[in-house]
């Protein structure tokens, strides 16, 4: 079965209506919507080539598409993500009475290996946070951002989109709008507060110049920084700190925040609230990282290990 670049326009319309509904009802971020669109366009292209339509494709047809993805060597994680988009689409079509049934409900999800978040030690975190030169406005901004990330466990997308009204230095909290438009208040800690205050007074005016902006951490062009740019900045400082960048991810400080809290006995549900996880099982993966770290310390320092 071949895949072509064309799609049925009626099916395309259904997908666009679905994406609009996801944006309005669930407040999904642009990145998530773009991922849904990309995955669903692949489905529509395959359907067009194989004479299926959204309003009559059966469970068997969707299973054929799953087999096609396996034949095309898509990773398990990619196939699981695509299946998630497909299920949401067919749930929507069933709800809107485009279909009398939901064939996706019986699809079997690919089994995913449990992946532990990439972990760095407290010493490596200290080295990373000490890498920026606070005498330079750009690096002072980066220093404040890194301190805030480690203090709060924010997602990178949440960090770069912060506005001045989201931060209360007096109360010591940051108000974050996370996935699905859910708001949460996260304490910042004195160290992060001090560096943010220093940046706002000394570094931010130098970056903004004559430009007005509500963004807390503007780029050199006085715009909102992209998450890709900030990831490049993290890798830049990791090299300075002597940390192997192959062992880093954009959320390295979010992972360190969660793992180190658990290492020091924080309650799992408190960590869940701080991270903005809707499901406790998502947070529980960090307990495995914390346990592995404790085992490592035990084997290194116990005389009978």
Curated annotation (Swiss-Prot):
Provenance organism: Vibrio vulnificus (strain YJ016)
NCBIfam families hit by this protein: PRK00283.1 (NF001399), recomb_XerD (TIGR02225)
Active site: 155, 179, 251, 254, 277, 286 (o-(3'-phospho-dna)-tyrosine intermediate)
Identification of the protein by name: Tyrosine recombinase XerD
Matches recorded under InterPro entries: CB, DNA_brk_join_enz, Integrase-like_cat_sf, Integrase_catalytic, Integrase_recombinase_N, Integrase_SAM-like_N, Recomb_XerD, Tyrosine_recombinase_XerC/XerD
HAMAP family, alphabetized: Recomb_XerC_XerD (MF_01808), Recomb_XerD (MF_01807)
Residues covered by the Core-binding (CB) domain: 9-94
Residues of the Tyr recombinase domain: 115-299
Top-level taxon of origin: Bacteria
Family to which the UniProt record says this protein belongs: Belongs to the 'phage' integrase family. XerD subfamily.
Subunit structure: Forms a cyclic heterotetrameric complex composed of two molecules of XerC and two molecules of XerD.
Cross-referenced PANTHER family: PHAGE INTEGRASE-RELATED, TYROSINE RECOMBINASE XERD
Keywords: Cell cycle, Cell division, Chromosome partition, Cytoplasm, DNA integration, DNA recombination, DNA-binding
Chief subcellular location: cytoplasm
Cellular localisation: Cytoplasm
An annotated GO cellular component: cytoplasm
Described function: Site-specific tyrosine recombinase, which acts by catalyzing the cutting and rejoining of the recombining DNA molecules. The XerC-XerD complex is essential to convert dimers of the bacterial chromosome into monomers to permit their segregation at cell division. It also contributes to the segregational stability of plasmids.
CDD domains, A to Z: INT_XerDC_C (cd00798)
Gene symbol of the encoding locus: xerD
SUPFAM superfamilies in the cross-refs: DNA breaking-rejoining enzymes (SSF56349), lambda integrase-like, N-terminal domain (SSF47823)
A GO term, aspect molecular function: tyrosine-based site-specific recombinase activity
């Amino acid at each position: 079965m071949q895949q072509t670049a064309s799609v049925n326009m009626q099916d395309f319309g259904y997908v666009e209506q679905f994406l609009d509904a996801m944006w309005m009802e669930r407040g999904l971020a642009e990145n998530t919507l773009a991922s849904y669109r990309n995955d669903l366009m692949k489905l529509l292209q395959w359907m067009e080539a194989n004479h299926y339509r959204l309003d009559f494709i059966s469970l068997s047809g969707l299973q054929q598409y799953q087999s096609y993805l396996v034949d095309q060597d898509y990773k398990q994680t990619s196939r699981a993500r695509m299946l998630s988009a497909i299920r949401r689409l067919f749930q929507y079509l069933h709800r809107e009475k485009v279909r009398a049934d939901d064939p996706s409900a019986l699809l079997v999800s690919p089994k995913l290996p449990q992946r532990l978040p990439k972990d760095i030690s407290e010493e490596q975190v200290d080295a990373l946070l000490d890498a920026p030169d606070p005498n330079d406005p750009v690096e002072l901004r980066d220093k404040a951002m890194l301190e805030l990330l480690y203090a709060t466990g924010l997602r990178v997308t949440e960090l770069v989109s912060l506005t001045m009204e989201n931060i209360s230095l007096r109360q010591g909290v940051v108000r974050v709008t996370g996935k699905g438009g859910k708001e949460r208040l996260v304490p910042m800690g004195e160290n992060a507060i001090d560096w943010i205050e220093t940046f706002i007074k000394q570094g931010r005016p130098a970056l903004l110049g004559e430009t007005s902006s509500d963004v807390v951490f503007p780029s050199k062009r006085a715009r909102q920084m992209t998450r890709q740019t900030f990831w490049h900045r993290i890798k830049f400082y990791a090299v300075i700190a002597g940390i192997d960048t192959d062992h880093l991810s954009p959320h390295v400080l979010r992972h360190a925040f969660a793992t180190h809290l658990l290492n020091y006995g924080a309650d799992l549900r408190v960590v869940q609230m701080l991270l903005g996880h809707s499901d406790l099982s998502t947070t529980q993966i960090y307990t495995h990282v914390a346990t592995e770290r404790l085992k490592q310390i035990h084997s290194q320092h116990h005389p009978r290990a």
